[in-house]
């Protein structure tokens, strides 16, 4: 047997052990498959209660293998236990106390890191930095692009507004022209209506004037003594004298003619 080879492990590690389980109970169950050297149920250093697992050490490896094969996944003291070969040597109570206080110290964790883990960490950190840089660059580009788009939109908006105003102004002018035309037509219709309403009055007044003028002329013909309008008193006197002389001459002629008959 070489000095570098270790003796075969004869200890079994048992999980899911009930709190009420005693070492005598485990010794009775496992002692069926061979002589047992030691049974150990670790207790909590502060509460003094079982921690839920136990160790059973046999004298022969073949006995330990038989116990593992027959009792694994079996019900012992009200629980289904799991059995496997223990890894490492049995720890002392002082080692268990330090393990409970410091289950995994950061210094041990740092020391236990392998160079490959350190390399992967450095790579992951560099990858994270590169990713952050790329994200920041993307954000800056996105901001610039959005800013340029907002600028272009702000520049294009006034042009659209001016074009919209230019396109709207002719409509307003057309509307004002239509309104002015409608107003002028209304004024013309009103003036025509007024003229039509005033024309009958004028006609009636002209008719009354013509009638009065005819009556006046008849009165002048009947009464020659009255002076018509537009003649002076001397002219009227001369005309009346001539008219009377003509009447007297015609009467004398008619009288002579009668006497001749």
Swiss-Prot record:
Looking up Pfam families in the UniProt record yields: RRM_1
What ranges does the record list as Basic and acidic residues composition bias? 88-109
What region holds the RRM domain? Answer: 10-88
Composition bias (Polar residues) maps to 230-239
Q: Which InterPro entries match?
A: Nucleotide-bd_a/b_plait_sf, RBD_domain_sf, RBM, RRM_dom
Predominant location of this chain? nucleus
The annotated regions of Low complexity compositional bias extend over: 192-209
Start and end residues of each stretch annotated as Disordered: 86-261
Q: Which domain of life is it from?
A: Eukaryota
GO terms (molecular function) for this protein are:
RNA binding; RS domain binding; unfolded protein binding
Provide this UniProt record's keywords sorted from A to Z.
mRNA processing, mRNA splicing, Nucleus, RNA-binding
Q: Where is the composition biased (Basic residues)?
A: 110-122, 178-191, 240-261
A cellular component annotation (GO) from this entry? nucleoplasm
User: Its Gene Ontology biological processes?
Assistant: mRNA 5'-splice site recognition; mRNA splicing, via spliceosome; negative regulation of mRNA splicing, via spliceosome; regulation of alternative mRNA splicing, via spliceosome; spliceosomal tri-snRNP complex assembly
Q: Where in the cell is it found?
A: Nucleus
| Tissue expression notes | Expressed in testis.
Function per UniProt: Splicing factor that seems to antagonize SR proteins in pre-mRNA splicing regulation.
The family annotation for this protein states:
Belongs to the splicing factor SR family.
| Protein name as catalogued | Serine/arginine-rich splicing factor 12
Please give the organism: Homo sapiens (Human)
Q: Which gene encodes it?
A: SRSF12
